[in-house]
């Protein structure tokens, strides 16, 4: 082998290594559905919807609310609330250590963000679960933030919208967590008594105590495409009943077919569609009178709520 043959492969390896070093980390993400490798800035422009197969990837709570609400006038609700390890709980790790790790990973205090703002000029209060924070589990802070958001919506007479993404109640808070199911449900009952609309948007995934309480109590329940929604997971159910579940069981399309949700809305259409529904429920004129929105919510559902309001 000549001296040139010895040098050239070494130079090629060095150049390849330099190129790899010049590419920043976190620029690419693989679609869990079609496995296409996606350029992250492009994916974010598509609101985390795969441009190849239209799969809805999970979206952080803050990005979701910043995208959903108008840019001007957003105001966070109860941003200063911090979780407390009252029980000194420990499983394989201390609860306080899990909280610290989740806060560092997500840069959020807990698994729910609440904001007051506008949707195409219509005042609204919106909350969103952060699934990356301990699986979006509901503890005392999540419940308190939700109740404060519902209270503000009731006092101001503006619609409340919830984007749910949760594994359920937070086991590290035991009964303090389970109490939030009743607490949030009671807040929504007060909202209903005042005739204030509550729209629940079910995103992937929604399970456990969250699905058994606030997530399924919407005046209109909306789901994103192919979202996994239920109480217990499909594997748990199969092991319990010892039967094979139907294809697509617990997916939003299956739930729509069986009447559990009222409509499925693509993420790109969410602002327009929910804005249209809320304007109907609050008897507000549409922004664009010439373009009638394509609502798939049954008119009877909207009429029932309007009649209950009177």
Curated annotation (Swiss-Prot):
One of its GO terms (biological process) is malonyl-CoA biosynthetic process. Keywords: ATP-binding, Cytoplasm, Fatty acid biosynthesis, Fatty acid metabolism, Lipid biosynthesis, Lipid metabolism, Metal-binding, Nucleotide-binding, Transferase, Zinc, Zinc-finger. It catalyses: N(6)-carboxybiotinyl-L-lysyl-[protein] + acetyl-CoA = N(6)-biotinyl-L-lysyl-[protein] + malonyl-CoA. It is an enzyme of class 2 (transferase). Zn(2+) binds at residues 31, 34, 50, 53. A zinc finger (C4-type) spans 31-53. It is found in: Cytoplasm. Its EC number is 2.1.3.15. Pathway: Lipid metabolism; malonyl-CoA biosynthesis; malonyl-CoA from acetyl-CoA: step 1/1. Its main location: cytoplasm. Belongs to the AccD/PCCB family. Acetyl-CoA carboxylase is a heterohexamer composed of biotin carboxyl carrier protein (AccB), biotin carboxylase (AccC) and two subunits each of ACCase subunit alpha (AccA) and ACCase subunit beta (AccD). HAMAP family: AcetylCoA_CT_beta. Component of the acetyl coenzyme A carboxylase (ACC) complex. Biotin carboxylase (BC) catalyzes the carboxylation of biotin on its carrier protein (BCCP) and then the CO(2) group is transferred by the transcarboxylase to acetyl-CoA to form malonyl-CoA. This is Acetyl-coenzyme A carboxylase carboxyl transferase subunit beta. It comes from Chromohalobacter salexigens (strain ATCC BAA-138 / DSM 3043 / CIP 106854 / NCIMB 13768 / 1H11). The lineage of its organism: Bacteria, Pseudomonadati, Pseudomonadota, Gammaproteobacteria, Oceanospirillales.
């Amino acid at each position: 082998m000549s001296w040139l043959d010895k040098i050239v492969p070494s130079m090629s390896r060095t150049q390849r290594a330099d190129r790899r070093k010049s590419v920043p980390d976190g620029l690419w993400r693989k679609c869990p559905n079609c496995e296409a490798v996606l350029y992250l800035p492009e994916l974010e422009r598509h609101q985390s919807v795969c441009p190849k197969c239209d799969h809805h990837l999970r979206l952080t709570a803050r990005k979701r609310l910043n995208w959903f609400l108008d840019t001007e006038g957003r105001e966070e609700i109860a941003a200063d609330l911090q979780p407390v390890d009252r029980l000194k709980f420990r499983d394989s790790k201390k609860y306080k250590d899990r909280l610290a790790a989740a806060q560092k990973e997500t840069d959020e205090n807990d698994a729910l963000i609440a904001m007051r703002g506008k949707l195409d000029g219509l005042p609204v209060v919106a909350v969103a679960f952060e699934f990356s924070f301990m699986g979006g589990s509901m503890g005392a802070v999540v419940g308190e933030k939700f109740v404060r958001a519902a209270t503000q919506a009731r006092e101001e007479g503006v619609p409340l919208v919830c984007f749910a993404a949760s594994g359920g109640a937070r086991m590290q808070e035991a009964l303090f967590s389970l109490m939030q199911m009743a607490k949030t449900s009671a807040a929504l009952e007060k909202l209903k008594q005042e005739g204030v609309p509550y729209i629940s948007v079910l995103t992937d995934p929604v399970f456990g105590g969250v699905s058994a309480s606030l997530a399924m109590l919407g005046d209109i329940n909306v789901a994103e495409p192919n979202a996994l929604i239920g109480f217990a997971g499909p594997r748990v159910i199969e092991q319990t009943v010892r039967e094979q579940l139907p294809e697509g069981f617990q997916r939003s399309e299956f739930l729509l077919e069986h009447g559990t949700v009222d409509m499925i809305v693509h993420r790109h259409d969410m602002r327009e569609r929910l804005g249209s529904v809320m304007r109907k429920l609050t008897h507000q004129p549409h922004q664009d009178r010439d373009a009638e929105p394509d609502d798939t919510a049954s008119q009877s559902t909207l009429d029932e709520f309007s009649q209950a309001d009177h």
